[in-house]
Amino acid sequence: MTRRNDKSNPRLAELIRLLKQTSRENEVEIWSDIASRLEKSRKNYAEVNVSKINRYAQEGETLIVPGKVLGSGVVEAGVTVAALSFSDAAVSKITEAKGQCISIEQLLSQNPKGSRTRILR
């Protein structure tokens, strides 16, 4: 018998369901990819420092982090970052650089097609 992989966090379970539904409705693979990453064990979630965001992002770009954004390093580009959660230091550094920190749910409602977004892990 296999064990069901249900998430005990109701917000996360609803987010995964919403990501899969939006992926099917809009025929976009990016949301199903994010959902499959969030369905995995929590120890496999992405933990991205703002220095990595600074290294790979250009001004005005939208990035998705299927995990947590941490505050180590500096960010110079004003980017929009959507993630499952943010540390307090990461939020302050991104907003100081004229960027935005939004939840994955907000990005999903703003951009259901997932156009011009990149996954960072």
Curated annotation (Swiss-Prot):
Keyword field: Ribonucleoprotein, Ribosomal protein
Coiled-coil residues: none
GO MF annotations in UniProt: RNA binding; structural constituent of ribosome
Any one cellular-component term (Gene Ontology): cytosolic large ribosomal subunit
One BP annotation, GO: translation
UniProt family annotation: Belongs to the eukaryotic ribosomal protein eL18 family.
This protein's name: Large ribosomal subunit protein eL18
Name of the coding gene: rpl18e
